Design a protein with these regions (language model features):
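Binuclear metal-ion centers of metallo-dependent hydrolases, dominated by the metallo-beta-lactamase
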Residues: 88-198
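Active-site-proximal loop/helix segment associated with metal-binding centers of metalloenzymes
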Residues: 1-82, 86-94, 101-103
Length: 198
């Protein structure tokens, strides 16, 4: 079951209309401080469920237990940005605030982008990595690689290793190069993991 999400769209810069979408958890469940409940003589059971829902509870002994006294502060809402074709990563600066993951195209390395010129309106790995680093986004997933970058190094003059090397030169967070059918999970701890393949 998916949590409630807030979705926002940001127009990107490309030859045709392209958009980025940010997905932010709208409601983050607060955790009960069970040690404090036990220490206060509140036995586990239906009362805990009511407190978890933010409702005060009248105990059989006549005490009123206030939910706010036993709920830990909520964790930070998780936020993911998924962008389409875009030659200006900085258009996402407003959305990148507090983002946990940025998924963005990195079609070329800087060298190939300079050789091709601005016409195709795509980003280089360095452009995206510099942006993600400046925005303090802890997880970056690069996508939409030009076919000139072969999947296996040594089979041609360019490989995905070139994209990865360029990105790592500008970005110190968790970096992934997405492959077709990859699935990622963002844990409640903010750690991005490659999910078990289908």
């Amino acid at each position: 079951m998916l949590p409630d999400l807030r979705v926002r769209a940001t127009k990107l810069s490309h030859r045709i209309d392209c958009w980025a979408y940010s997905f932010t958890e709208a409601a983050v469940e607060r955790r009960l401080d069970t040690d404090k409940l036990r220490a206060g003589g509140v036995a586990s059971g239906p009362a805990w469920g009511e407190l978890q829902q933010g409702r005060d509870v009248l105990l059989p002994d006549g005490r009123t237990v206030h939910a706010e006294d036993y709920l830990a502060p909520p964790r930070k809402s998780r936020k993911i940005i998924i962008g389409g074709d875009n030659d200006t990563p900085s258009l996402l600066a407003g959305e990148a605030v507090d983002a946990d993951v940025l998924v963005h195209e990195a079609t070329y390395t800087e060298a190939i982008l300079h050789k091709i010129g601005p016409g195709p309106q795509h980003s280089s790995a360095a452009m995206v990595a510099r942006f993600a680093s400046a925005a303090s986004v802890p997880n970056l997933v690069l996508t939409h690689f030009s076919p000139r970058y072969l999947d296996k190094p040594g089979n041609g003059p360019l490989s995905l290793d070139d994209i990865e090397r360029e990105a790592r030169a500008h970005y110190q967070g968790t970096l992934a190069l997405a492959r077709d059918l990859d699935r990622y999970e963002l844990g409640k701890d903010g750690v991005l993991r490659l999910a078990v393949p289908i």
